[in-house]
Amino acid sequence: MDELLEKLLNDLKKKEPKACSIICIGEDLDIIQCMNEHGCFSGGSYSELSNDCETVNFRGIAYKCFFTKDQVKVNFWQISHLTGGLFNFLVSQALNEHGLDLLWIIMVVAQTLSALVSFPEKLLNILRNMKTILINTEETVRNRFEESQNKKLVALLDKNSTTLDISSGILLNFTVVLKQLKHALGLHTSVDNSQEFILQFLRTTLLSVPTSSIVSISADPTSWNNLNVLMKYNFMFQKFKPRDFHAQTIQSETMFIPPCWDTISKIQSVNHEFNIALFKQTAKNFYDTLDISLLLGLFDKSISMLNCHSSKISDGDIPYKSHQVFLQELQNKYSEIKTYSSNKLNKSSIKSSLWKDLIQ
């Protein structure tokens, strides 16, 4: 390995998270309290909410700030409705404070008929905002590269970040939480039919978002365990690292994830170790997977059919990518990245080809 890249890698390994952010989208403003009551923030790696934590609540936007027992700052944003401008602001805040790799977006959906029917449109709007903001973020980062190309490579590291926030910014941690309400159970079959459609829609849509997940929670305290696991995985608190995460740690009856979770972990690990060298390649590949334009027509059709109580849409109407195909694509990308990073780069190639690839 080139001496400069090796030094960069060693510096990255020494860094520990100093801050992270959670953006919770939904009208359930008590979600943070529920997460705390069910052990997501207490015990183990987390401390309970401090009494002196900062609290702001204004017109559907709530902000709380607290610290883990390891003094990791946690910014918690709760918003009832996400707009493009607000999302841009929150992403900018995360980028400036700790990097996009330590940002976790949670969308909470109550399992009621009205919420489930309006959910697909809200989800697609969020994904559209995510894609737009990420593209703008990439342009900003690329401009920073152009401005800094005469400086040392290590100087590009954000002093408050665990990574360079370049390739890892493409992989936003995104989770949809389906919250089961006691009074909504067993009322009528319309809710059950909508739930079935939503799961089908979610599984298909989130195949295009590599680091996405679906979690179902209820009054049962054990149903919150998966959120706890996800938080450890996303933020890598203490000794919990991606390499320690396996699909077996997930309860299959309460959580559904796109395939190749372990492969995604490997891709993220490589990106963290070779952020600069792999920026352009990974950015291009993962932006391609976040293309949801084909789903927009599906949304209009599916909602119309739900409102008219028509038959469910068929599998053939959904632009679906099989797990096997998705797995093979991810494995191919990982192989390309591994091969790329394994090439022996000398100092001259760093100065010439690397910068040339990054800024073109």
Swiss-Prot record:
GO terms for cellular component: cell cortex; cortical microtubule cytoskeleton; cortical microtubule plus-end; cytoplasm; cytoplasmic dynein complex; cytosol; meiotic spindle pole body; microtubule cytoskeleton. GO terms for molecular function: dynein heavy chain binding. The N-terminal part is acetylated. It is found in: Cytoplasm, Cytoskeleton. Keywords: Acetylation, Cell cycle, Cytoplasm, Cytoskeleton, Dynein, Meiosis, Microtubule, Motor protein. One of its GO terms (biological process) is nuclear migration involved in conjugation with cellular fusion. InterPro entries: Dynein1_light_intermed_chain (IPR008467). The dynein complex consists of at least two heavy chains and a number of intermediate and light chains. Interacts with rga3, sec10, sec16, syp1, rvb2, spbc19c7.04c, spbc2f12.05 and spac3a11.10c. Component of the cytoplasmic dynein which acts as a motor for the intracellular retrograde motility of vesicles and organelles along microtubules. Promotes oscillatory nuclear movement and efficient pairing of homologous centromeres during meiotic prophase. Belongs to the dynein light intermediate chain DYN3 family. This is Dynein intermediate light chain dil1. The gene is dil1.
